[in-house]
Amino acid sequence: MKSTLSLTLCVISLLLTLFLAALDIVIVVTLYDTIGIKFHDFGNIGWLVTGYALSNAVFMLLWGRLAEILGTKECLMISVIVFEIGSLISALSNSMATLISGRVVAGFGGSGIESLAFVVGTSIVRENHRGIMITALAISYVIAEGVGPFIGGAFNEHLSWRWCFYINLPIGAFAFIILAFCNTSGEPHQKMWLPSKIKKIMNYDYGELLKASFWKNTFEVLVFKLDMVGIILSSAGFTLLMLGLSFGGNNFPWNSGIIICFFTVGPILLLLFCAYDFHFLSLSGLHYDNKRIKPLLTWNIASNCGIFTSSITGFLSCFAYELQSAYLVQLYQLVFKKKPTLASIHLWELSIPAMIATMAIAYLNSKYGIIKPAIVFGVLCGIVGSGLFTLINGELSQSIGYSILPGIAFGSIFQATLLSSQVQITSDDPDFQNKFIEVTAFNSFAKSLGFAFGGNMGAMIFTASLKNQMRSSQLNIPQFTSVETLLAYSTEHYDGPQSSLSKFINTAIHDVFYCALGCYALSFFFGIFTSSKKTTISAKKQQ
């Protein structure tokens, strides 16, 4: 039985690491205008979120496999280090390409933090308490969602946008130290975990690096244990799709050869990934280290209806939430010309309802074990709320009122879909621990992919809508070759939210909101087919 102190330290470390990853996702929302104008590249500004979220998503499954081999604590600490390196690159960048590269590295580390924090958190408590643990982690996530843009806006206005990335360094270091000394398994030998690891590193025979056998073994581990072929195929496929969405209509015409190539080769690579993992590795009968080779994503996990439907519902919810949260801030920055700090306060209109929803769902789940009703309730709130969200016109009371239901929808779905996936794995399964890690990683992968596509799709819809309106307008303003120069002009010549140019920007933002409505409408069809399984509750609670 884990001691109270050990459990408390473990939970604190998980809350800090997850807060760190969530903070980095949303802190850049208020930087769109500043960085887009500074680097003269508003067309690719969506990659501030997408660059992070894409690498966050595609490597989520890899961290799950690494955790099976190296251990969850070790991988969680490594992911924090990688995340810090990415944050430092972003803070020191002097071009959009370098900044996006830093975001990609940070996303790689963040994927380990997000997936493994939930794995550790939900595995150190009983099944009927998982909802409470997910709530604690989700609240940490939601708080970061709320304060992140506010902190980003304050740094952007009073210091520099670079401090939005520097802030991750001390927080990450503090989380790393606590994690290094906390016990995530309850086993006594972990108390001396850090000194033993340092000693092992110091005493390692680095002469092995010069031997062919070392590199042969490394290659075999990468291919057979980590499924590097599957990682390359899936990450390349998703990246090409994202590049097509980002460059289409901005850098290249939609009917250009390179865009067609992106949208052709990308899906082909994803199909090859599915064929390799689901068919070739499963039927080949290959063995490594006396064990059957297991693909990164097994067909048993991906084809499980309960896991698939809940993960897709989570994907669509995160897709919609990214569109709504990012462009709610943009509405107040670009149309009403509020400072980044004041504009970011409006995110609390979504975050507070989401926080309340996660706590309510956790209570109901721990008491009654229900999951599916929370998902269905969430998607219905998402449909109605997203419809109201498209009516926001800048009035404070209206903005607050119309944000309640979308916030509740996100909070309900984010938590309940993870629980719905996890209950598909029974505790008496002989391979329970590994399957539990895989299912949690797959669910987190789907949600991160939703954030990635949401950020990219939002930028694409916004720029395309604005360009189409300007092309058919009769405004007496200079001709602009890019959206970023147009937005810079609107800032320098701002003449109120009712001006023709502000109305064009307002319409483009609302087109993004309509896309969020479509996501929730689609999520309804997956939500109603999620599993009806409940979490196990103790006999004492049932009485």
UniProtKB/Swiss-Prot annotation:
GO molecular function: transmembrane transporter activity; xenobiotic transmembrane transporter activity
Intervals, Extracellular compartment: 30-41, 101-103, 153-162, 249-255, 322-341, 395-399, 465-508
Pfam families noted in UniProt: MFS_1
Location of the protein in the cell: Membrane
Ranges per topology, Cytoplasmic: 1-8, 63-79, 125-131, 184-227, 277-300, 363-373, 421-443, 530-543
Membrane-topology annotation of the record: Multi-pass membrane protein
UniProt superkingdom: Eukaryota
TM regions (residue ranges): 9-29, 42-62, 80-100, 104-124, 132-152, 163-183, 228-248, 256-276, 301-321, 342-362, 374-394, 400-420, 444-464, 509-529
GO CC annotation: endoplasmic reticulum; plasma membrane
Keyword annotations: Membrane, Transmembrane, Transmembrane helix, Transport
Function: Drug export permease. Multi-copy suppressor of loss-of-function mutation of GAL11. Involved specifically in transcription of GAL4-dependent genes. Can link GAL4 with the basal transcription machinery if GAL11 is missing. Confers resistance to 10-N-nonyl acridine orange (NAO) and in general to cationic dyes.
UniProt record similarity statement: Belongs to the major facilitator superfamily.
Protein name: Protein SGE1
